[in-house]
Amino acid sequence: SGYSYHVMPEVAWGINKNLMVRTSMFVSNSNNQLVAEGASFYTKYRFLSTDDLQSHFRMAAYGRYSFNNATIHQEQIEIMGQNSGFETGIVATQLIKKLAVSASVSYEKAFDNKPDYRFPVAQSDNAMNYTLSLGRLMYPKKYTNFKQTNINTMIEFVGQTLNENGKSYLDIVPSVQFII
C-alpha cells in the first residue's frame, strides 16, 4: 500500500495517588499485514509530593519492560514499539500557577527481539534518556469547577545518548493536550 504505520493502544490505571500501571500493545503493518508485534508493561511510583495552593513539586520512579518480535531496524533504542528490553528512571515535575515544568532521566537496555532477531553487536544496546517538558494551561482562564476540560500547549525535548558509542538524538515535540 505504500504506507507504514504503528498503532500502540494502551490502558492505564491509577491504583492510588502514588501508584500507576500501564500496559501497551504494539501493532503495525510492516509486513504488509496488520500484526501484533509486542507489548509493554509500565509502573510509576510517586515517592515525593509537596502540594500547595496553585503549585506542587512531585518526584516519581518508573520502570518499563517490553518485548517485541519485529525486526531491529534502527540504531536508536526504543522499547516503546521497536526493541525488547527495559527502562528505569526518575521524573520530577514542578507546577507554578499555569506553568508546568517536567524533567526525567532514565537508563534503557535493549535485548534481542524474538523469535531470532539479534541486537546488532556493532550497535550500543544501552542508553541514557532525558526529557525536558514545558506546558502551559491555556483554557480555562479561570476554574469554576474541576470537571472542566483543560487545554494545554506544550513543548518537549526528548533526548537519548547511546552509552557505547556516544551518539545522541534529540527530538523537539510541540503539542496541544486536551484533558477531558
Predicted segments with their positions:
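Transmembrane beta-barrel domains of Gram-negative outer membranes and organellar outer membranes
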Residues: 1-103, 107-112, 121-180
